[in-house]
Amino acid sequence: MLLLINNLILNDVPTPWGLYFQDSSTPNQEGIIELHDNIMFYLVLILCTVSWLLFSIVKDSSKNPLPHKYLVHGQTIEIIWTILPAVVLLIIAFPSFILLYLCDEVISPAMTIKAIGLQWYWRYEYSDFINDSGETIEFESYVIPEDLLEDGQLRLLDTDTSVVCPVNTHIRFIVSAADVIHDFAIPSLGIKVDACPGRLNQVSALIQREGVYYGMCSETCGVAHSAMPIKIEVVSTKEFLTWLNEQ
């Protein structure tokens, strides 16, 4: 118990029987979790109210002194059940519209990473950086086969090459595909964007803590769809520059 209290254990990978979000690492994901919690509050409130009304109707139906066949209309209750749901929907809609706009907005990114989906692996390009040969940094990332996994590596999640990003840096991901539709999704970063052939989609992320984040292709793309993991290592700026010099 003391270990759990004194050490923050963050969840950046899928867990067995998980029923909630992974721990967030970007403002976008924080907003998604907050919106989810707010909507769940209204859903639980509505569920309890409707359940209580249904229980009361069934329980007291035989005690009703006014038979329902003589009840021709109820203007007050009709106004209530028309206006109240509309108000609840508006309360839910406005925050969701704001969050949707913020998630799509990309303003002055510090760097750009291009992710291209192929059957069944990812290719990444760092177009802002050029190596000694005058070429942009690019590499391919494949899932590590189960028989080659080392201790501590995750089945169908670890890759032979990782995307490396600096912490606290505004990063733009440009996502596309070379064959069929894929989907670039990292839950902890609040990223989920379709990778479509012939189209460039973009999303931004401000990753606020170092760590290793896992994602998957979230669009059925063929027989090896489950073998398209995404692994992102977030390091300090100094470590990122060291990694760049090694490429």
UniProtKB/Swiss-Prot annotation:
Keywords from the UniProt entry: Copper, Electron transport, Magnesium, Membrane, Metal-binding, Mitochondrion, Mitochondrion inner membrane, Respiratory chain, Translocase, Transmembrane, Transmembrane helix, Transport
CC cofactor note: Binds a dinuclear copper A center per subunit.
Catalytic reaction list: 4 Fe(II)-[cytochrome c] + O2 + 8 H(+)(in) = 4 Fe(III)-[cytochrome c] + 2 H2O + 4 H(+)(out)
Membrane topology of the entry: Multi-pass membrane protein
Family recorded in the similarity comment: Belongs to the cytochrome c oxidase subunit 2 family.
Pfam families: COX2 (PF00116), COX2_TM (PF02790)
InterPro entries registered for this protein in UniProt: CcO_II, CcO_II-like_C, CcO_II_C, Copper_CuA, Cupredoxin, Cyt_c_oxidase_su2, Cyt_c_oxidase_su2_TM_dom, Cyt_c_oxidase_su2_TM_sf
EC number: 7.1.1.9
Transmembrane parts of this sequence: 39-59, 79-101
Source superkingdom: Eukaryota
Binding site for Cu cation A2: C217, E219, C221, H225
Cofactor(s) for this UniProt protein: Cu cation
Binding site for Cu cation A1: H182, C217, C221, M228
An example Gene Ontology CC term for this record: mitochondrial inner membrane
GO aspect biological process, one term: ATP synthesis coupled electron transport
Ranges in the topological domain labelled Mitochondrial matrix: 60-78
Protein location: Mitochondrion inner membrane
Organism, scientific name: Cyberlindnera mrakii (Yeast)
Quaternary structure (record): Component of the cytochrome c oxidase (complex IV, CIV), a multisubunit enzyme composed of a catalytic core of 3 subunits and several supernumerary subunits. The complex exists as a monomer or a dimer and forms supercomplexes (SCs) in the inner mitochondrial membrane with ubiquinol-cytochrome c oxidoreductase (cytochrome b-c1 complex, complex III, CIII).
Main location: mitochondrion
Protein purpose: Component of the cytochrome c oxidase, the last enzyme in the mitochondrial electron transport chain which drives oxidative phosphorylation. The respiratory chain contains 3 multisubunit complexes succinate dehydrogenase (complex II, CII), ubiquinol-cytochrome c oxidoreductase (cytochrome b-c1 complex, complex III, CIII) and cytochrome c oxidase (complex IV, CIV), that cooperate to transfer electrons derived from NADH and succinate to molecular oxygen, creating an electrochemical gradient over the inner membrane that drives transmembrane transport and the ATP synthase.
Mitochondrial intermembrane-side positions: 12-38, 102-247
Protein name: Cytochrome c oxidase subunit 2
Binding site for Mg(2+): E219
Molecular function in Gene Ontology: copper ion binding; cytochrome-c oxidase activity
Name of the encoding gene: COX2
PTM summary: The signal sequence of COX2 is processed by IMP1.
